[in-house]
Regions:
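Short, Lys/Arg-rich, polar N-terminal cytosolic tail immediately upstream
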Residues: 1-11
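Divalent-metal-activated hydrolytic enzyme cores
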Residues: 13-16
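Hydrophobic alpha-helical transmembrane segments of multi-pass membrane proteins
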Residues: 19-36, 47-71, 75-104, 113-130, ...
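Non-cytosolic membrane-interface motifs at loop->transmembrane helix junctions
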Residues: 43-48, 105-116, 174-186
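Membrane-interfacial segments
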Residues: 70, 132-140
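Interfacial loop-to-transmembrane-helix boundary motif in multi-pass membrane proteins
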Residues: 138-154
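Alpha-helical transmembrane segments and their cytosolic membrane-interface
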Residues: 153-189
Length: 190
């Protein structure tokens, strides 16, 4: 199934906007590094941030490859491109969390980035399920039931992540901007 000719302009515009978004995220990672002082990061943290930025670049490269598809985009390609955008967002939030770690004045922002990072993991898992289901053309009764379960469980999982903004269920960031797991961390990852 390809995008109809009348929809081609919207497809191209949306896809190009996504590529621009990926470029902005890579630039924002670099700007954040300069702003908060990436030189203060321990070497292992700096390596992690660098890997995140390279990961965003790889997402952009793969996204561009999908954009160059000459025959339009079928459902699996569109879902794959959505996963690339979600992964790039997750990588950006991870890089931001590492760069904000240990800055007391930004502990609230660090908490928000961690919460959004956890939410992005859940959303990425859901998008992966949708991609696999479309790729394998799983339309039988069992797949539909699994899809229903995934959709029903998505809201409570996101709610538990968002609850970390107010109650330290899985983690907390102290006043010094340092991240800590709570006893409920493993449970919050399920």
């Amino acid at each position: 199934m390809t995008v109809a000719d009348g929809e081609r302009w919207n497809w191209e515009w949306n896809a190009k906007a996504g590529l621009l978004f990926l470029g902005v995220m890579a630039a924002a990672s670099a700007i954040l590094g300069v702003t908060v002082g990436a030189e203060r990061l321990p070497p292992a943290w700096a390596l992690n941030v660098g890997e995140d930025v390279v990961g965003i670049a790889v997402c952009a490269l793969l996204y561009y490859g999908c954009l160059c598809e000459k025959q339009g985009a079928d459902e699996t390609t569109r879902l794959f491109m959505a996963m690339l955008l979600a992964e790039a967002i997750k990588l950006f939030l991870d890089a931001a969390s590492w760069m904000l770690e240990g800055i007391p004045a930004l502990h609230g922002l660090n908490t928000v980035t961690y919460v959004l990072f956890l939410c992005s993991i859940i959303l990425l898992g859901y998008q992966f399920w949708r991609y696999i289901r479309a790729y394998l053309a799983m339309n039988d009764a069992f797949a539909r039931r699994c899809d229903r379960v995934m959709r029903v469980m998505l809201a409570p999982a996101l709610a538990l992540c968002l609850a970390n903004l107010f109650v330290p269920l899985g983690f907390y960031v102290d006043e010094q901007g340092v991240y800590y797991n709570t006893d409920g961390y493993l449970l919050s990852m399920i």
